């Protein structure tokens, strides 16, 4: 009967924390199943971190379409269908859900430390823009908390470059951080972290949870949820701010989000925005309800307001914030905070190569070249240090918080394939998440940026034609692995031979001489047999054949003479050349389609014959030969062109005369006439 038993609800989850460590939750160790409530998972994480002020934090995940969600403590894991569809294993991201309006008033050091890690991550990834002077001050506090007091023997030149604080970190900023760090003697890590938060909370974008939306004419806006209210950004500028006490309704329907605000004249105004998708709109609505409840209402009104706000959504969409509000947390006297004898364990931050003088050979690709210039005849030089490529920390085994877009470390799925929009980031950085950029992907390697850059250079060095060959080699490799023993070895050997042969065939060669030889042979062949040419495509040109044109122009002299001074008798005695053309009979096929008829005629005759046959009647079947001969000069009796046609006969005669010039032996110019006769014997239809 065991086969009829229910399948055990196995659950395997990885939680990525703010200090870049990982917590694994499984059914065997913690007893977590798919029927477990989200609050149980949160409790395991809070106990691991030793947090008591837990209402500021949450767990986030994303679905297959890279839409982010917060784990609902009141629902079971199985009810989070978007999460279940992504695994197993499942990945959750720990972070701040509600930013404290004044993080310096947090009661415990461990809570402030988690806020410090989150805000430092926000500044590093561009979600918290900082002026240069503020960034230098915050970086100095972070270095003081990380390394302690400045020691000239331990902290040599360029030691600040081992850490990253802002995107596109410059050398000038690192020098300013080093100068300020020397003035922070005696500050403990907890004090330095407190000063860091005190500086960060004054920034405009502190604690802003951004959501991309669209306004009128599909113009891009950002709605930011803050402790004080909702701010609206357009083109990196704040265009509106609505405080929570003034917001009377939040509503969504499909992809439309409504924000109703009470004005100073006690009139309500509704603002409508369009979200990217229905799930994104619902997520924005949920976050708005939770922020409004957490920061706005006192403890006596929080439940009633939550029920009221839950009715603002569409039918069957109700959401209630189940946690405590900020006011409830401040008035909670059940736990005496801070707890005595609390020891906060801090982790080292991710490190990068130090900016040092160049000691590597010329061909090194890992460290950029630096130059040393001697000034005023001194022996010591001024060294210009350029930031090297970042590498993975020797201690951390996870992939997070990269300021460089081409690092080989893995990122959160909503960072890599998120919406192409952002507030303070460029178009290349707009795939970053509005929150929680740390991530893990199971099948990605964790190499350094140097390895990835070298790999990209190697890939670019190959010919573009190797793409199809690479796919073919992969298919061959997969087929080879299905066998075993000597057959597999032989197939692998053949595969290597084929790969080497393919690489040799793909080498670039100079094809200029070969191409010239082909053109030369083709030209000789065409000169030997003009009728051997076959066109493989439609030719839109109807010009005569070049060879026929050259043959015709041999009998024509192009020096024109003005006949105004010649007498009437001299004009009558103008000599001319009689030229006749001939060719092989050509079979003409009648067709209903003019295009196919023209194509058939062009494929059956040369270009020279096409010009001669342009006057042939389409109703005939055969065209007799049109020979090309040179006749002796003949005398004409007129200076004008004469056309003789015999209607109803089989032959037609066309005579044309033109005045050309010749030079007699005495050196006097005389006028000549070239008489061109086109004779065509037509076979009548029987």
Swiss-Prot record:
<dbReference type="InterPro" id="IPR014847">
    <property type="entry name" value="FA"/>
</dbReference>
<dbReference type="InterPro" id="IPR019749">
    <property type="entry name" value="Band_41_domain"/>
</dbReference>
<dbReference type="InterPro" id="IPR019747">
    <property type="entry name" value="FERM_CS"/>
</dbReference>
<feature type="modified residue" description="Phosphoserine">
    <location>
        <position position="304"/>
    </location>
</feature>
<feature type="compositionally biased region" description="Basic and acidic residues">
    <location>
        <begin position="547"/>
        <end position="561"/>
    </location>
</feature>
<dbReference type="InterPro" id="IPR000299">
    <property type="entry name" value="FERM_domain"/>
</dbReference>
<feature type="modified residue" description="Phosphoserine">
    <location>
        <position position="389"/>
    </location>
</feature>
<feature type="compositionally biased region" description="Polar residues">
    <location>
        <begin position="442"/>
        <end position="455"/>
    </location>
</feature>
<dbReference type="InterPro" id="IPR011993">
    <property type="entry name" value="PH-like_dom_sf"/>
</dbReference>
<feature type="modified residue" description="Phosphoserine">
    <location>
        <position position="402"/>
    </location>
</feature>
<dbReference type="GO" id="GO:0008092">
    <property type="term" value="F:cytoskeletal protein binding"/>
</dbReference>
<feature type="region of interest" description="Disordered">
    <location>
        <begin position="332"/>
        <end position="669"/>
    </location>
</feature>
<dbReference type="InterPro" id="IPR030696">
    <property type="entry name" value="Band4.1-like4A_FERM_F1"/>
</dbReference>
<dbReference type="InterPro" id="IPR018980">
    <property type="entry name" value="FERM_PH-like_C"/>
</dbReference>
<feature type="compositionally biased region" description="Polar residues">
    <location>
        <begin position="357"/>
        <end position="382"/>
    </location>
</feature>
<dbReference type="GO" id="GO:0005737">
    <property type="term" value="C:cytoplasm"/>
</dbReference>
<dbReference type="InterPro" id="IPR019748">
    <property type="entry name" value="FERM_central"/>
</dbReference>
<dbReference type="InterPro" id="IPR000798">
    <property type="entry name" value="Ez/rad/moesin-like"/>
</dbReference>
<dbReference type="InterPro" id="IPR029071">
    <property type="entry name" value="Ubiquitin-like_domsf"/>
</dbReference>
<dbReference type="Pfam" id="PF00373">
    <property type="entry name" value="FERM_M"/>
</dbReference>
<feature type="compositionally biased region" description="Low complexity">
    <location>
        <begin position="479"/>
        <end position="489"/>
    </location>
</feature>
<protein>
    <recommendedName>
        <fullName>Band 4.1-like protein 4A</fullName>
    </recommendedName>
</protein>
<feature type="modified residue" description="Phosphoserine">
    <location>
        <position position="393"/>
    </location>
</feature>
<dbReference type="InterPro" id="IPR018979">
    <property type="entry name" value="FERM_N"/>
</dbReference>
<feature type="compositionally biased region" description="Polar residues">
    <location>
        <begin position="332"/>
        <end position="346"/>
    </location>
</feature>
<dbReference type="InterPro" id="IPR035963">
    <property type="entry name" value="FERM_2"/>
</dbReference>
<dbReference type="Pfam" id="PF09379">
    <property type="entry name" value="FERM_N"/>
</dbReference>
<feature type="compositionally biased region" description="Polar residues">
    <location>
        <begin position="418"/>
        <end position="428"/>
    </location>
</feature>
<dbReference type="GO" id="GO:0005856">
    <property type="term" value="C:cytoskeleton"/>
</dbReference>
<keyword id="KW-0597">Phosphoprotein</keyword>
<feature type="compositionally biased region" description="Basic residues">
    <location>
        <begin position="588"/>
        <end position="601"/>
    </location>
</feature>
<dbReference type="InterPro" id="IPR014352">
    <property type="entry name" value="FERM/acyl-CoA-bd_prot_sf"/>
</dbReference>
<keyword id="KW-0963">Cytoplasm</keyword>
<keyword id="KW-0206">Cytoskeleton</keyword>
<dbReference type="Pfam" id="PF09380">
    <property type="entry name" value="FERM_C"/>
</dbReference>
<dbReference type="Pfam" id="PF08736">
    <property type="entry name" value="FA"/>
</dbReference>
<feature type="compositionally biased region" description="Basic and acidic residues">
    <location>
        <begin position="518"/>
        <end position="527"/>
    </location>
</feature>
<feature type="compositionally biased region" description="Basic and acidic residues">
    <location>
        <begin position="648"/>
        <end position="658"/>
    </location>
</feature>
<feature type="domain" description="FERM">
    <location>
        <begin position="11"/>
        <end position="299"/>
    </location>
</feature>
């Amino acid at each position: 009967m065991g086969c009829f038993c229910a399948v055990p609800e196995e659950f395997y989850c990885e939680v990525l924390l703010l200090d870049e460590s990982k917590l694994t939750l499984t059914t065997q160790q913690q007893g977590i199943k798919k029927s477990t409530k989200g609050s149980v998972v949160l409790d395991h994480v809070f106990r691991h971190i030793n947090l008591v002020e837990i209402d500021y934090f949450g767990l986030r995940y994303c679905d297959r379409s890279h839409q982010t969600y917060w784990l609902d403590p009141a629902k079971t894991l199985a009810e989070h269908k978007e999460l279940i569809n992504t695994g197993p294993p499942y990945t959750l991201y720990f972070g701040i859900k509600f930013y404290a309006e004044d993080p310096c008033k947090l009661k415990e050091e461990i809570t402030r430390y988690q806020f410090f890690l989150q805000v430092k991550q926000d500044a590093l990834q561009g979600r918290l823009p900082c002026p240069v002077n503020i960034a230098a001050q915050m970086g100095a506090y972070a270095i003081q908390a990380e390394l302690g007091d400045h020691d000239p023997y331990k902290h040599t030149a360029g030691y600040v470059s081992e850490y990253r604080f802002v995107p596109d970190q410059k050398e000038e900023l690192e020098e300013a951080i080093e100068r300020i760090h020397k003035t922070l003697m005696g500050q403990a890590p907890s004090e330095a972290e407190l000063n860091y938060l005190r500086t960060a909370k004054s920034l405009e974008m502190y604690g802003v949870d951004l959501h991309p939306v669209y306004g009128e004419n599909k113009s891009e806006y950002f709605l930011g949820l803050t402790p004080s209210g909702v701010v609206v950004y357009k083109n990196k500028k704040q265009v509106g701010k609505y405080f929570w006490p003034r917001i009377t309704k939040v509503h969504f329907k499909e992809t439309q989000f409504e924000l109703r605000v009470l004005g100073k004249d006690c009139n309500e105004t509704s603002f409508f925005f369009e979200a990217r998708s229905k799930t994104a709109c619902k997520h924005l609505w949920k976050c708005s309800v939770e922020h409004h409840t957490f920061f706005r209402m006192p403890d006596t009104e929080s439940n009633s307001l939550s029920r009221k706000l839950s009715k603002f959504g569409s039918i069957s969409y109700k959401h209630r914030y189940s946690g405590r509000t900020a006011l409830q947390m401040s008035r909670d006297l059940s736990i005496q905070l801070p707890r005595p004898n609390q020891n906060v364990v801090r982790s080292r931050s991710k490190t990068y190569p130090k900016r040092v003088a160049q000691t590597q050979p010329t061909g090194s690709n890992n460290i950029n070249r630096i130059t040393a210039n001697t000034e005023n005849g001194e022996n010591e030089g001024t060294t210009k240090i350029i930031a090297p490529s970042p590498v993975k920390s020797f201690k951390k085994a996870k992939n997070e918080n990269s300021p460089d877009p081409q690092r080989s470390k893995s990122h959160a799925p909503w960072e890599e394939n998120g919406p192409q929009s952002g507030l303070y980031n460029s178009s290349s950085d707009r795939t970053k998440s509005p929150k929680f950029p740390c991530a893990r992907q199971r099948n990605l390697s964790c190499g350094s940026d140097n390895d990835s850059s070298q790999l990209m250079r190697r890939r670019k060095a190959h010919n573009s034609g190797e793409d199809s060959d690479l796919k073919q080699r992969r298919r061959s490799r997969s087929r080879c692995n299905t066998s075993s023993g000597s057959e597999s070895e032989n197939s692998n050997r053949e595969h290597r031979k084929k790969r080497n042969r393919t690489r040799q065939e793909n080498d670039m060669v100079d094809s200029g001489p070969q191409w010239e030889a082909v053109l030369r042979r083709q030209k000789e062949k065409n000169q030997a047999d003009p009728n051997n040419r076959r066109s493989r495509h439609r030719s839109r040109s109807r010009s005569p054949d070049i060879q026929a044109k050259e043959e015709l122009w041999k009998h024509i002299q192009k020096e024109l003479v003005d006949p105004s001074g010649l007498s009437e008798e001299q004009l009558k005695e103008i000599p001319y050349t009689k030229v006749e053309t001939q060719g092989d009979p050509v079979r003409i096929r009648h067709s209903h389609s003019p295009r196919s008829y023209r194509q058939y005629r062009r494929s059956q005759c040369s270009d020279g014959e096409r010009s001669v046959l342009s006057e042939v009647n389409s109703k005939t079947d055969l065209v007799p030969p049109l020979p090309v001969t040179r006749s002796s000069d003949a005398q004409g009796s007129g200076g004008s062109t004469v056309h003789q046609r015999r209607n109803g006969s089989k032959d037609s005669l066309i005579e044309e005369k033109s005045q050309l010039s010749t030079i007699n032996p005495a050196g006097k110019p005389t006028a000549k006439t070239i008489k061109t006769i086109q004779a065509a014997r037509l076979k009548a239809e029987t």
